[in-house]
Amino acid sequence: MKLVLIRHGESEWNRLNLFTGWTDVPLTPRGESEAQEGGRVLQEAGFDFDLCYTSFLKRAIRTLNFVLQALDREWLPVHKSWKLNERHYGDLQGLNKTETAQKYGEQQVRVWRRSFDVAPPPLTVGDARCPHTQASYRGVCASGRTPVLPFTESLKDTVARVVPYFEEEIKPQMISGQRVLIVAHGNSLRALMKHIESLDETQIMEVNLPTGVPLVYEFEADFTLCGKRFLGNEADVAARAQAVADQGKSN
């Protein structure tokens, strides 16, 4: 039993080194090429799928579209969920990571980006960046007095929405024999990787997921993890992962 994860290709705000979170930005031409290459790599390795999952954000949706084009599988069913969205970066969304590191220090930015349970400063009610008034989320209702949609998130918060969705919606499909592809985001996929690999809070801080590169997990029938590998040129995969690690440095 296999599961393939792909982080979306480079987005416009990745290129500009801005905190993105739930801001709905497009792919760059480079990001489109990364997505196409990810699809070609899967096709050359003989992968096929029955079911796809992605987020509400266009950079992931379009990455999936490019992958499916490369596989000649554009007709496959696709399930979209906000629970696979990127981690919400709160009031940091739209800020330059390098400038933020210069202002607050690299260590503080690293804590915001890579710690497990520290959330950035939240958005305030009425901020135009809040998802609560955006058309994409009009079907997502509040639960009681506590809004379902976040104003900010730590990775711990992201795990709390991603993992139940995986366990309740995706894993049963895999167990039934469906071949699943998930295209999502750096932190929503890190949340899932933490769960699948049983990583602790320190280990997950060191994980940098490259853009557009298929990550293949293999499982026994009882869902015991028995294999993990990236598909693609090893040097290219390492270079993309290092580029992610270098974000948020002051120089």
UniProtKB/Swiss-Prot annotation:
InterPro entries (UniProt xref): His_Pase_superF_clade-1 (IPR013078), His_PPase_superfam (IPR029033), PG/BPGM_mutase_AS (IPR001345), Phosphogly_mut1 (IPR005952)
Record-annotated site: Transition state stabilizer: 185
UniProt-listed GO biological process terms: gluconeogenesis; glycolytic process
Gene3D superfamilies from the UniProt entry: Phosphoglycerate mutase-like
SUPFAM superfamilies xrefs: Phosphoglycerate mutase-like
GO molecular function: phosphoglycerate mutase activity
Keywords associated with the record: Gluconeogenesis, Glycolysis, Isomerase
Pfam family membership, one: His_Phos_1
Record has Isomerase as a keyword: yes
Top-level enzyme category: isomerase
Catalytic activity, as annotated: (2R)-2-phosphoglycerate = (2R)-3-phosphoglycerate
Documented EC number(s): 5.4.2.11
PROSITE patterns per the UniProt record, alphabetical: PG_MUTASE
Pathway(s) the chain acts in: Carbohydrate degradation; glycolysis; pyruvate from D-glyceraldehyde 3-phosphate: step 3/5
Isomerase listed as a keyword: yes
Binding-site residues, substrate: 7-14, 20-21, 59, 86-89, 97, 113-114, 186-187
Organism superkingdom: Bacteria
Active site: 8, 86
Annotated function: Catalyzes the interconversion of 2-phosphoglycerate and 3-phosphoglycerate.
PANTHER family: PHOSPHOGLYCERATE MUTASE
Name of protein: 2,3-bisphosphoglycerate-dependent phosphoglycerate mutase
Taxonomic source organism: Treponema pallidum (strain Nichols)
